Amino acid sequence: MTNTRKTHPLIKIINHSFIDLPAPSNISTWWNFGSLLGLCLVIQIFTGLFLAMHYTSDTLTAFSSVTHICRDVNYGWLIRYMHANGASVFFICLFLHVGRGMYYGSYTYFETWNIGIILLFAVMATAFMGYVLPWGQMSFWGATVITNLLSAIPYIGTTLVEWIWGGFSVDKATLTRFFAFHFVLPFIIAALVMVHLLFLHETGSNNPSGLISDSDKIPFHPYYTIKDILGVLLLILILMTLVLFSPDLLGDPDNYTPANPLSTPPHIKPEWYFLFAYAILRSIPNKLGGVLALVLSILILMLFPLLHLSKQRSMMFRPLSQCMFWILVADLFTLTWIGGQPVEYPYIIIGQLASILYFAIILLILPTISLIENKLLKW
């Protein structure tokens, strides 16, 4: 009798995706982040669902309802801080996952790569709207500043902003719709994840060498299931350490003050995972230019397959490209730091230089170095 997992219509799909899936024998720990992102999404959906049971999306009661969750609901504080810090861990995994794709040339699977970038945009939008929900000072002013950027769009800008707000300022209508979108988007993300996996399994996984691995495949289970469990345990350890020892480490103290439209905080800044993009936005004095740079800072990832001029797929055997890649990583750390600093000398000029370097490395320096490496190898 044939094994049920190979014949049952539903179990067969799971089998081909997670059990009998042929995987390259040499994929490193950098390939663990896909499963970790799946875990993060599940954690966020479940903690978010339980938070939504107690949260009220009204300007008068939103802040109080979050306080109520933390004080009166059984383990409410745990659910709330797991959700807030879960977002941070989610973004750490996202950045590492994208960085891995850039380093090892995984972007040559361009359907998988482009859906991944759409996923990145969707997660960023979800996180932004989630940050508005507690209705603290930084929630309110963050929402005001970021939505206001759309007013830079010529002709339709102002109308568009008022349409998103549902009025003439960020108010009850804005909070209600942000809650609705924040609730529904993770399920859309989950559907997109399935499409992402569908396209990935059409081609199979890349591997550190960037070479075709068809001649040397091993089953996903037990080898990579065990490897993923190690990653899962480490992720849970990091998340729970953050939640139980310093839950407010990555948050903003201003968000413990209820939203007040009449009092602007001295430094409006988003959560840490948006700071690099925020620094790029602020480094351009023109409003429309800043908005374009902000969008392009992520959208530029879609150009990676077109900018790949090297004869080799991975950076594993390309030391010059490796060097530039790590300079890009250092540049992103610099931008993240600058995004959290006040707009004054010397931070302004450092931010501008770091922003120029970011686009220069991706659009100019990396492709040029790829051509130089081809020449050095007489290809």
Swiss-Prot record:
Signal peptide from the UniProt entry:
none
Q: Which domain of life is it from?
A: Eukaryota
Positions contributing to heme b b566 binding: 97, 196
Positions contributing to heme b b562 binding? 83, 182
Q: Where does a ubiquinone bind?
A: 201
Free-text cofactor note: Binds 2 heme b groups non-covalently.
| Entry's Gene Ontology molecular function annotations | metal ion binding; ubiquinol-cytochrome-c reductase activity
Q: Which stretches are transmembrane?
A: 33-53, 77-98, 113-133, 178-198, 226-246, 288-308, 320-340, 347-367
GO CC terms, sorted: mitochondrial inner membrane; respiratory chain complex III
- UniProt topology in membrane: Multi-pass membrane protein
Q: Which residues form a coiled coil?
A: none
The record's keywords, sorted A to Z, are: Electron transport, Heme, Iron, Membrane, Metal-binding, Mitochondrion, Mitochondrion inner membrane, Respiratory chain, Transmembrane, Transmembrane helix, Transport, Ubiquinone
Required co-factor(s) are: heme b
- CDD domains to which the protein is assigned, alphabetical: cytochrome_b_C (cd00290), Cytochrome_b_N (cd00284)
Pfam families of this UniProt entry?
Cytochrom_B_C, Cytochrome_B
The subcellular location is: Mitochondrion inner membrane
Q: Which GO terms describe its biological process?
A: mitochondrial electron transport, ubiquinol to cytochrome c
Coarse class of the protein's main subcellular location = mitochondrion
Tell me more from the record.
Heme 1 (or BL or b562) is low-potential and absorbs at about 562 nm, and heme 2 (or BH or b566) is high-potential and absorbs at about 566 nm.
Q: How does it assemble?
A: The cytochrome bc1 complex contains 11 subunits: 3 respiratory subunits (MT-CYB, CYC1 and UQCRFS1), 2 core proteins (UQCRC1 and UQCRC2) and 6 low-molecular weight proteins (UQCRH/QCR6, UQCRB/QCR7, UQCRQ/QCR8, UQCR10/QCR9, UQCR11/QCR10 and a cleavage product of UQCRFS1). This cytochrome bc1 complex then forms a dimer.
Q: What does this protein do?
A: Component of the ubiquinol-cytochrome c reductase complex (complex III or cytochrome b-c1 complex) that is part of the mitochondrial respiratory chain. The b-c1 complex mediates electron transfer from ubiquinol to cytochrome c. Contributes to the generation of a proton gradient across the mitochondrial membrane that is then used for ATP synthesis.
Write out the similarity annotation: Belongs to the cytochrome b family.
Q: What is this protein called?
A: Cytochrome b
Gene transcribed to yield this protein: MT-CYB
